[in-house]
Amino acid sequence: MKFELTDLLTIAKRDNNTLRPYLFVNPLQGKHIPADPKVSLQLFRLLAQKVEQRYQGERLLAIGFAETATAIGAAVAWYAENVAYYMTTTREDIAGAEYLHFTESHSHATDQRLIANGLEDCLETIDRIVFAEDEVTTGSTIEKCINELRRRFPASAKRFGIASLVNSMSDQRLSYFSEQDISCDYLYHIDRETMSWGFDENQWVEPHKSVKGAVEIVPTRMTYGNGWDERFVTPKAQFKDKIDTLMKVAIPDLALTAAQRKILVLGTEEFMFPAMFLGMRIEELHPDTTVRFHATSRSPIMVSEDVNYPLHTRSELESLYEKGRKTNVYNLCKYDLVIIVTDACEINEEGLQTLLHAICEHGNKNCILIRWRNDVP
């Protein structure tokens, strides 16, 4: 399948962010905008092929950046034959984790972390770390992570690479990374300076604040243990086995009917790839069914009535992971079935109520909640 730059690129405005007021929103990424999971994974596979071709003969650790690029990193690990290990960065507090800290200065949540547990042993067996992103603007956040890795593991002189769907680094920054022997691979390069916004900034609408309390939807709850957390460095074989196991147990339990022709699979915050993969498998097994996937997000983005703008509705939620944490879900609409897939070990029930309210307010009546718990086998 061939993709054009216009397929991957729309521009939106961050809510109350003066450091970097605009961001690229990829309609095929499956984060903010509902996307066909099969098409999203085909796109990510193209990036995985670039990684595989670039680093032939090397053993790689693929790291997906939270929050938006965790599924991209997982897909690179899944499809690139030379990836031996996979993990993601995180903003979560994980029991028993030791962290490497660095910052993402332009973000709505500046603190980023990489879990150090098991990383030193992994580094002894690989040749290179490849960071996977949706879009790289300056590369400064990745550079900070590299510096922290070098500081923490000085005896491990590993090489590094960057793989992104879109790259908008200046020629100067690209040259800098080349001089540092850090390869940059991407599907498209764009010049931010020549980009036009193409939307009317006078048509902003207020986000809808979803409320707590009793809801009309009572989700069917399914809980599976996996004893695995993608935020910890994981051998690829184990990662793939965990995903395959979820597919084998969850899909029969869904008991999908012929009347459920339009389905949304919704991930939560950093947790995307297993849910996206589930959506793709549902499509494969039920070819007459239309499946869409996206995920809740911490990122606050403006919404607009302008038809040329990518985001039209925003429901403000409380997180399933933590009381008081604000999250958002964009561009909800009506489906025959909504399947929420989360790795929240202890779900914040008040947060779940806000999400169910938002789903209900867009005309949805049927919901399944899948908890893929990493704290039990």
Where are these regions (language model features)?
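PRPP-associated nucleotide enzymes
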Residues: 1-377
